[in-house]
Amino acid sequence: MKRTISIIAAGLLFLFPAISNAQVAITAVPFLQIEPDSRGAGMGNTGVAIADNASALFWNPAGLAFQKGSNQASITHSNWLANFNVSDLFYDYVVGKYYIEGIGTIGAHLTYLNLGEQIETYEDGPEPISRFNSYEVALGGSYGYQVSKNFAVGSSLRLIYSSLASGTSVSAQKVNPGSSVAVDLSFLYKTDIFALGGRDAQFSFGSNLSNIGPGIQYTDNAQKDPLPQLLRFGWAFHLDLDDEGINRITLANDISKIMARTKPVYTTDNDGSIDTSMVASGPIEALFNSWSSFERFDGQKTIEVGLLQQFMIGAGLEYWYADQFALRAGYYYEDPNNGDREYITFGAGIRYSFLGVDFSYIKTLESDHPLANTLRFSLLIDF
């Protein structure tokens, strides 16, 4: 894939936002928000209250505490932004969980987003200056602890490395790789199985505050971009449709919000001029100052994003037959002023012996949306 510096610069606008008088919520490394498993993606990006397989490491690591006596590995692949028809723009997620008697279930994951080969050119001509590859990667581990029969807590630790335009310059500033470390904190509550209309049912509720950590610095100055610290909470309802539990459905709903802010810092040069740089609010500070509106530049004008507009909503339905065949559907929504992603999702899964395969498909409401026709494929292996 070969893209000129104009496309690179357009992407880096997210890293070097226009300065406004209000705090803004632009974050670095948004690849950490990509829902990694085809099951949750097929259910409208839901999973914080389900978290019953290896991908609990992403959705809710507390879910590991309820997964006793089972081991699993999974890999997900997606040709990201398929509408761009670019072969080396892809996303991979590898995850595994392992149960240790007397300790519990632990897990590890690797997330990789390849952005392909870039070409830096002069502003006044197509002559190449340099070529480089852009990619982002995260590596982490998780653990869930069962506090009681129905309640568990969990945590993850991950290392993050982002190499977008290393060695190039943007606005006379040299761009370096960025790195950081992040923590997730979560809980999951499951009711006892109860009877509903003569059928077994269960309700669960969970929350996960992910990517808690210091901002990433790409340039030599003090500018830092916040991590996509995300608060996700939701519920799930499981119901057997017959006495034997052969037919089963799950309804799920996730609500999430970015808990991050950048703020301007002003310094005075020796000649009296004032320089302004954007610095990420600390993760604890952002938990308190993210509950208000913020302003951002949409390319043409400055717009205000209200608090309710900052929430992202996903809802999904899953049907299982004999724990072997699954069908899924869902809906995902973001406000037009805050991401503007709205689409329906479809998915299916099959389980046979120790193997499982899931896939999901995104049907955007706009035919030319970058996420249109995005497919994810996941392979699961129990051992």
How does the language model describe each region?
Residues 10-11, 54:
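Residue-level detector of alpha-helical transmembrane segments in integral membrane proteins
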Residues 2-10:
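Sec-dependent signal peptide recognition
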Residues 23-383:
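Subset of outer-membrane beta-barrel
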Residues 2-3, 17, 121, 140:
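A detector of low-complexity, intrinsically disordered, Ser/Thr/Gly/Pro/Ala-rich segments
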Residues 11-12, 69:
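Repetitive helical segments and hydrophobic/amphipathic motifs
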Residues 16-22:
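Sec/Tat signal peptide C-region and signal peptidase I cleavage site
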